Amino acid sequence: MIIDISCYPTDQVDLAWCHEGEPYTMDRLLETMDGPYFVNGKPRRIDKAFIQPPQGNTIYTWTDGDKDGRQSIDDYMAYTLKCVRKHPDRFIGCFVYNPRCGVKNGVEAIERYVKEHGFKMVQMQANMHAYRPDRALDWVRPAFEKCAELGVPVVTTVAVRKRGL
């Protein structure tokens, strides 16, 4: 079985990367996953994928003044949840934790998405959400503790390096 651990289907353009053209929907992702890809000369497909929203669409500032933290979380996770529900045989939910939506809101959402929706992993995108995990322990420690309690792994991205830096 081949499992991709980082896919970002969406029904809207990623707000951070300003991609042009059509959004990378669940149908496009499934088509990509179906391949075929040749491994040791044999045609294969990607059997399952951990999916989460594109990180640019999880930035809290785009809802400032319109929604509270929990509403913002549920909005940015909505398409991922829809995909997981529609194709549970192919997609595994990965919750994106953004402490800028409120630590309490985020920790409660981790538990809700794992227990109620069957999500199996949590991702922290410190670079997109503008914090350093080593300096924001009050933000990340409660989330790590909740993930440990629930037995779900955490993927943490701390920086994107560019050439010359």
Regions found by a protein language model. Name each.
Residues W62-G164:
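Active-site gating/metal-coordination segments in enzymes
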Residues M1-S72:
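An N-terminally biased module of ancient metal coordination in phosphate/nucleic-acid-related enzymes
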Residues R28-E31, Y37, T156-L165:
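Proteins with a high burden of low-complexity, intrinsically disordered sequence enriched in S/T/G/P/A and R
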